[in-house]
Amino acid sequence: EAERSKENALGLLMKQALEGVVAVPWTLMLDKWRMAVFDGSLNEEELNDYWWELRKKYQGVESPIDRPDDAFDPGAKYHIPGNTPYTRYYLARVLQYQFHEALCESMSFEGDLHECSIYSNDEAGLRLRNMLAMGQSQPWPDALETITGQRTLSGKSLLNYYAPLKEWLDEQNRNRACGW
């Protein structure tokens, strides 16, 4: 029964990671490409090649076919022609886990971070409410500090949340060549 429970937890973590964690390099890559366009470091002929260079570097994927010289694959993502920054999605992912870990710590939770629930916890609710009540009246580092005790963003909480999954994946992939 304990083994089945562990498998269920790993399955849930895998599902969550495939929905959320894989978005982190995509969101970073997309705005890195946008910034290179805006700062003028790319000419028109390099736009698509640089897109695929970043996709390979950050996501480990390549175009399934050779791309013609006039291809503009970035335009398929509506945020590109719509000139919509994507950094907000990157920050949201990082902050989601940072907030969760801080709120779990505020209620003295002990255990794997993915098992913590802040539901109906008065202390966690008060911290979250106090931060949200600030609205735009304070700089964001002040709001972050209210809930986390820190003034900087950190990806450590994301790593802590998925630590059991990473441990399992490391074991499954032992003696295998993984990566790009």
Placement of each model-derived feature along the sequence:
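C-terminal, non-catalytic "cap/extension" segments appended to globular domains
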Residues: 3, 7, 11-13, 19-180
